[in-house]
């Protein structure tokens, strides 16, 4: 029997995933993080991107797009507190491409530093979402 860790992925709106996993991978602030059972305690910010969960006794990984947030790792428990979280199967490529286009337009027409920072964040989120969609389509997790 494989070792597991309990994983909770939650957003402000709802709980997206809760269950036992053999492995979790996600975009940390300093790069891609891989969490296995028994990982040392850790708390860090996460960047927009795909959280991949290798669920116990399941061939396919669960994929959840997060728009940033916090990761907390404790013995036996991994918690992802996401600003926004969308199940991989619910991602909409057309909406993501439209969000990217609008963010690029806002960057070109910014009227203040605040507008520029907001547009940069929206662009980074849209690009990460598109990358997650493309990886899902190709079967690359």
Swiss-Prot record:
The keyword Flavoprotein does not apply. CDD domains: F1-ATPase_delta (cd12152). It is found in: Cell inner membrane. GO terms for molecular function: ATP binding; proton-transporting ATP synthase activity, rotational mechanism. One of its GO terms (cellular component) is proton-transporting ATP synthase complex. InterPro entries: ATP_F1_dsu/esu_C_sf (IPR036794), ATP_synth_F1_dsu/esu (IPR001469), ATP_synth_F1_dsu/esu_N (IPR020546), ATP_synth_F1_esu_C (IPR020547), ATPsynth_dsu/esu_N (IPR036771). The keyword Ion transport applies. It is a peripheral membrane protein. Its main location: membrane. Keywords: ATP synthesis, Cell inner membrane, Cell membrane, CF(1), Hydrogen ion transport, Ion transport, Membrane, Transport. NCBIfam families: ATP_synt_epsi, PRK00571.1-4. Produces ATP from ADP in the presence of a proton gradient across the membrane. Belongs to the ATPase epsilon chain family. F-type ATPases have 2 components, CF(1) - the catalytic core - and CF(0) - the membrane proton channel. CF(1) has five subunits: alpha(3), beta(3), gamma(1), delta(1), epsilon(1). CF(0) has three main subunits: a, b and c. This is ATP synthase epsilon chain. The lineage of its organism: Bacteria, Pseudomonadati, Pseudomonadota, Betaproteobacteria, Rhodocyclales. The gene is atpC.
